[in-house]
Amino acid sequence: MLRLVLLLLATDFAASDDSLDSSDSQLIKRSQFRTPDCHRFDYPVCSKHLSPVCGTDMNTYGNECTLCMKIREDGSHINIIKDEPC
């Protein structure tokens, strides 16, 4: 009976491990993150132009300028994962 339970657990673990392999292809590699170009923005005001970006902190920012404002205020290091909402 114990062998059967262990065999079922091992089979279930192997199946879940396969699903991890298939989802790895959907993950974004760190080398693909884009560094925001914060030098091109005039502070302390950003335009209201909506062009969402997804930061590496998994927050969506209204545009690259608002992400740069967050970096400037907090001193945090946030890159851009993609040019659309998270």
UniProtKB/Swiss-Prot annotation:
InterPro entries: Kazal_dom, Kazal_dom_sf, SPINK2. Residues 1-16 form the signal peptide. The keyword Disulfide bond applies. SUPFAM superfamilies: Kazal-type serine protease inhibitors (SSF100895). GO terms for biological process: acrosome assembly; fertilization; male germ cell proliferation; male gonad development; positive regulation of apoptotic process; seminiferous tubule development; spermatid development; spermatogenesis. The record marks K48, H49 as: Reactive bond. One of its GO terms (molecular function) is serine-type endopeptidase inhibitor activity. Keywords: Cytoplasmic vesicle, Disulfide bond, Protease inhibitor, Secreted, Serine protease inhibitor, Signal. Its main location: secreted. Pfam families: Kazal_1. GO terms for cellular component: acrosomal vesicle; cytoplasm; extracellular region; neuron projection. It is found in: Secreted; Cytoplasmic vesicle, Secretory vesicle, Acrosome. Residues 32-86 form the Kazal-like domain. Disulfide bonds join C38-C68, C46-C65, C54-C86. PANTHER family: SERINE PROTEASE INHIBITOR KAZAL-TYPE 2, SERINE PROTEASE INHIBITOR KAZAL-TYPE 2, SPINK2. As a strong inhibitor of acrosin, it is required for normal spermiogenesis. It probably hinders premature activation of proacrosin and other proteases, thus preventing the cascade of events leading to spermiogenesis defects. May be involved in the regulation of serine protease-dependent germ cell apoptosis. It also inhibits trypsin. This is Serine protease inhibitor Kazal-type 2.
